[in-house]
Curated annotation (Swiss-Prot):
This is UPF0150 protein ssl0259. The lineage of its organism: Bacteria, Bacillati, Cyanobacteriota, Cyanophyceae, Synechococcales. Pfam families: UPF0150 (PF21748). One of its GO terms (biological process) is regulation of DNA-templated transcription. It comes from the Bacteria. Belongs to the UPF0150 family. It comes from Synechocystis sp. (strain ATCC 27184 / PCC 6803 / Kazusa).
Length: 73
């Protein structure tokens, strides 16, 4: 699944990126490309761990609906 990603620039340089739907799924890097590469690794590990523990994955449709509600507010 392709969950929405939020990217923040860091004041000291570099970036932090997160997937809000996947609690704790975030990464940082010096460049945008490095940050996104790291985030994809973390996402894969997050999903693998969730499957190992038989956790239900967040619905992509629900996450998109949340974003639409937030942007309309």
């Amino acid at each position: 699944m392709n969950y929405p990603i939020v990217i923040y620039p860091c004041a000291e340089g570099g970036f932090v990126a997160e997937i809000p739907a996947l609690c704790g799924c975030l990464a940082q890097g010096e460049t945008l490309e490095e940050t996104l590469e790291e985030l994809m690794i973390v996402k894969d590990l997050w999903l693998e761990t969730a499957q190992t523990h038989n956790q239900k994955l967040p619905s992509l449709e629900a996450e998109i609906a949340k974003i639409k509600m937030l942007s309309a507010a």
